[in-house]
Structure formats: structure tokens, C-alpha cells
């Protein structure tokens, strides 16, 4: 089958001079099942059961790197040819597997049935299966479902679908006092840093979605204000707004500038004295700015090309251009959510070329023509581009690595400096 590429330019945001290029064609992305790799570590009493093929099982196993004698909190109910052909009742087999799993693992309190490309192709209704199984195993186990399929999605949308499925389960907030909800997976160490910062500012109560334990689901209601920690949570944000919560407009907490603006949005919403805000944040800001100085020398003036991969590209481009002095050749993103990224777009250079969507062949042609100093791309493109003499950075590493907050600003900068240093050593 031939996929026809379609490209068009759409009006740029107010501060940008170049139209946003929109492309539709062949893509190079992982599927949403990849999100299980970090989500199963985050929610410590949850289990993710993928209903999919052997390919799905190999993807998760290799991406997570779990040793064979470990007892991980994910598995794959493998669909055989007879299931795909409709020769067996997939629901009966799924019920058997879930019963066996929960009998063996009584520590599981939250079970996600995760759809895949094969289960969606045969129209297996996992939402009905989750409802049916919940009636059997509640209240001891909560059973939910979401899609991790790679059909017309990118890999970070797996987390969005997972969290969106959790929102209807969140308890209703009681009382009239305002509360803050931070939405999006972050490393525990990063969460702890933000908790200390919010406590010093006098902001609270502060809760996180996803929680570390399903028994401590955050409450939500009309007095809930929420900050997005990740830019790929459109469905989750919409579900929270349907519950009455209010999203705080802010850049994302990448780098010194982004973290400060993100924290300031919360401080303003809770009427925190600006003098107190400066006093609390200044020490960490100063440390982060000093740490970035070393990497700025290496990265300033370097040209970078970002392929669409994770939806982190716009915040990363802002950080790289404004705090490290890099030149943006092209910033690709799988999907441009203009409302959630409005504060980021205001901070980009006015002449930046943004591409929404992907036609991988056309983007490869532009990348080869530009010959940037550094290319941020998926694993499938990295080795071929390296063979052509380009320096690459794996985009997926930016999702697996703790990069939010002041203390991680230098770690984020190092991720971009490291490939250039490696290349310099190889050619020396």
C-alpha cells in the first residue's frame, strides 16, 4: 500500500513569522505500549496486562529490560492466530488469564487491560471486559482499560490514555479550599523536589497524578487547579476539566526558565507573595544557571534538527534556543496542541520552522540538506543518519530520563552535549 503524503501550511501563532508546516505521510514512531515501561514503575501496586501479539510482548520486554527471574508488573496476553481469526471466544480466555493473574498476585490492586493494534483490529471491547471483570473482583481490585495501540498515535499518548482512564475513578474533592494537582509522570526524586518547593512556598495541598499507589488517588473538583508536567496529556486535561478542575497556563518545567515560570503559575494562582517566591526559588535557580554555563559553551551556536517523536519537542526547543543558545533548524512535533503549548510558543524565536505531523522521507531530505550539528530522532532513524556522518540523540531517552526541575537542568543539557563530545572524540 502506498501512503500519499499531504503537506500544507497553516497560520502561525501570533509571535511566529513562518507558517506551521503540516505533513501527513509515513511515520517513524513507537506505539503507546512503550508508556508501560515508566508507568509500571510509577504506580507501585498496578499491573498492566497487554492484550496483543508476540511483537507487543517483545517490545515491552526489551524496552523495560527486566531480568527473567524478576516478577514485573506487566505481561502480555498473547493473541494467537485462532483468536485473530475469530475461532475462539477471546473474552472467555481473557477472563481465565485475569483470574489466574489475580490469584497468583494478590498484591495487585489496580489492573489495566491495555489494548494494542491486534486487539483493536478484531474489535475486542476491553472497556466492557474491564467492567465485567470489575464486578467479579471489586472492591479488592480496580480494573480499567485503555488503548496503547500505535494506530494514528505516538508513543507518549499511551500515558495520556492511561491517566485519562483513571480520572473518572478519582474521588470528588470535599471542602471549598483550593488544591493543586500536578499531572504527568515524573521520577520520584523530581516529585520530591517539587513537593519541598511547594511546601516552602506555602502551596497546598499538592497531589500528583499518577500517584505512587492506587490507594492514594488524588481528589478532584471545582476548586482543583492543575499543572501539566508533560505536554502530551490532552485527553487527561480534558477529563479533569470535565470534573471541574482548572488548568494553570504555564510553560513546562524544563530548564531554569521553564521551571521558574511553571512554579510561578502555581504561586500566582495561590496568591503567594512575589518576594517569598523569589526567596524560595533563587538558590536552586542560581545553582542551575551555574551548572548550565559549562554546557552553554559546548552547545551555543550549534544547529539542531528535531524530528517529531514525543511531543516534548516544543518545550525542548525553547530550552535549547533560549538557555543554551542553539539554533533551531526545524522543530517537528507529532501533534501541536496550541492551547497547552501557547506559553511555550510565545518564547520561541519568531523565525522558527515548526512541522506538525510527519512525512519521514520529506523530513529526511530536509535534514540531509541542512546538515545540522545535532539531530534528535527516533531509534529507527538514528543509526542510518549516524552512518551518513550526522550526530544524533535518541528522542526516547528524553522521556526515560529525569529532566524536569532546577536540579535536572544540567542533566538535560548534558543529554544534548554528550553526542557532540562523543563525535569529537571519534574524529580526533
Curated annotation (Swiss-Prot):
<comment type="subunit">
    <text>Protochlorophyllide reductase is composed of three subunits; BchL, BchN and BchB. Forms a heterotetramer of two BchB and two BchN subunits.</text>
</comment>
<keyword id="KW-0408">Iron</keyword>
<dbReference type="GO" id="GO:0046872">
    <property type="term" value="F:metal ion binding"/>
</dbReference>
<dbReference type="InterPro" id="IPR050293">
    <property type="entry name" value="LIPOR_BchN/ChlN"/>
</dbReference>
<dbReference type="GO" id="GO:0016730">
    <property type="term" value="F:oxidoreductase activity, acting on iron-sulfur proteins as donors"/>
</dbReference>
<keyword id="KW-0149">Chlorophyll biosynthesis</keyword>
<dbReference type="InterPro" id="IPR005970">
    <property type="entry name" value="Protochl_reductN"/>
</dbReference>
<comment type="pathway">
    <text>Porphyrin-containing compound metabolism; bacteriochlorophyll biosynthesis (light-independent).</text>
</comment>
<dbReference type="GO" id="GO:0036070">
    <property type="term" value="P:light-independent bacteriochlorophyll biosynthetic process"/>
</dbReference>
<keyword id="KW-0560">Oxidoreductase</keyword>
<feature type="binding site">
    <location>
        <position position="31"/>
    </location>
    <ligand>
        <name>[4Fe-4S] cluster</name>
    </ligand>
</feature>
<comment type="similarity">
    <text>Belongs to the BchN/ChlN family.</text>
</comment>
<dbReference type="GO" id="GO:0051539">
    <property type="term" value="F:4 iron, 4 sulfur cluster binding"/>
</dbReference>
<keyword id="KW-0479">Metal-binding</keyword>
<feature type="binding site">
    <location>
        <position position="117"/>
    </location>
    <ligand>
        <name>[4Fe-4S] cluster</name>
    </ligand>
</feature>
<dbReference type="GO" id="GO:0019685">
    <property type="term" value="P:photosynthesis, dark reaction"/>
</dbReference>
<keyword id="KW-0602">Photosynthesis</keyword>
<keyword id="KW-0077">Bacteriochlorophyll biosynthesis</keyword>
<dbReference type="InterPro" id="IPR000510">
    <property type="entry name" value="Nase/OxRdtase_comp1"/>
</dbReference>
<dbReference type="GO" id="GO:0005524">
    <property type="term" value="F:ATP binding"/>
</dbReference>
<protein>
    <recommendedName>
        <fullName>Light-independent protochlorophyllide reductase subunit N</fullName>
        <ecNumber>1.3.7.7</ecNumber>
    </recommendedName>
</protein>
<keyword id="KW-0547">Nucleotide-binding</keyword>
<keyword id="KW-0067">ATP-binding</keyword>
<dbReference type="GO" id="GO:0016636">
    <property type="term" value="F:oxidoreductase activity, acting on the CH-CH group of donors, iron-sulfur protein as acceptor"/>
</dbReference>
<feature type="binding site">
    <location>
        <position position="56"/>
    </location>
    <ligand>
        <name>[4Fe-4S] cluster</name>
    </ligand>
</feature>
<comment type="function">
    <text>Component of the dark-operative protochlorophyllide reductase (DPOR) that uses Mg-ATP and reduced ferredoxin to reduce ring D of protochlorophyllide (Pchlide) to form chlorophyllide a (Chlide). This reaction is light-independent. The NB-protein (BchN-BchB) is the catalytic component of the complex.</text>
</comment>
<dbReference type="Pfam" id="PF00148">
    <property type="entry name" value="Oxidored_nitro"/>
</dbReference>
<keyword id="KW-0411">Iron-sulfur</keyword>
<keyword id="KW-0004">4Fe-4S</keyword>
